[in-house]
């Protein structure tokens, strides 16, 4: 198993797909990296030579922000929004959708499990 940016890349998958297991690398960026290193996207990870793995590691770790660094930067960006008190920061703090989606219905993923609110009780019947 090749290890790039602290992630074990799956051996049986094509390199193009295997690189997407690294946080911060999608299919497009994976193709850019392979073009830069001159590696055929259709080769399997198990067939890569040590030199090719080293070239991939150099490009990924040198030119792109991935894994822990990227997660840390995203967390800091959200924390900055919260600290300066922007609308987006308040939405993050309250755990509500940030990008203008409706919340009267839907937004269940962001709001969490539905909390039932008791309905109004009927008055007792008079005799």
UniProtKB/Swiss-Prot annotation:
GO terms of biological process kind: translation
Protein name: Small ribosomal subunit protein uS13
Gene Ontology molecular-function annotations: rRNA binding; structural constituent of ribosome; tRNA binding
Oligomeric form and interacting partners: Part of the 30S ribosomal subunit. Forms a loose heterodimer with protein S19. Forms two bridges to the 50S subunit in the 70S ribosome.
Function: Located at the top of the head of the 30S subunit, it contacts several helices of the 16S rRNA. In the 70S ribosome it contacts the 23S rRNA (bridge B1a) and protein L5 of the 50S subunit (bridge B1b), connecting the 2 subunits; these bridges are implicated in subunit movement. Contacts the tRNAs in the A and P-sites.
Pfam families (alphabetical): Ribosomal_S13 (PF00416)
Family: Belongs to the universal ribosomal protein uS13 family.
UniProtKB keywords: Ribonucleoprotein, Ribosomal protein, RNA-binding, rRNA-binding, tRNA-binding
Gene3D superfamilies, alphabetized: 1.10.8.50, 30s ribosomal protein s13, domain 2 (4.10.910.10)
Protein's organism: Synechococcus sp. (strain JA-2-3B'a(2-13))
Biased composition (Basic residues): 101-127
CC annotations in GO: cytosol; small ribosomal subunit
Region (Disordered): 100-127
């Amino acid at each position: 198993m090749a290890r790039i940016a602290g992630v074990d890349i799956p051996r049986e998958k094509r390199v193009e797909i295997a690189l997407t297991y690294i946080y911060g690398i999608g299919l497009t960026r994976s193709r850019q990296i392979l073009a830069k290193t001159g590696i055929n996207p259709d080769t399997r990870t198990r067939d890569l030579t040590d030199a090719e793995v080293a070239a991939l590691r150099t490009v990924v770790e040198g030119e792109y922000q991935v894994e822990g660094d990227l997660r840390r930067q995203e967390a800091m960006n959200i924390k900055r929004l919260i600290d300066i008190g922007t609308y987006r920061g308040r939405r993050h703090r309250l755990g509500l959708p940030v990008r203008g989606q409706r919340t009267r219905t839907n937004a269940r993923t962001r709001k969490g499990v539905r909390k039932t609110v008791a309905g109004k009780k009927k008055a007792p019947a008079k005799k």
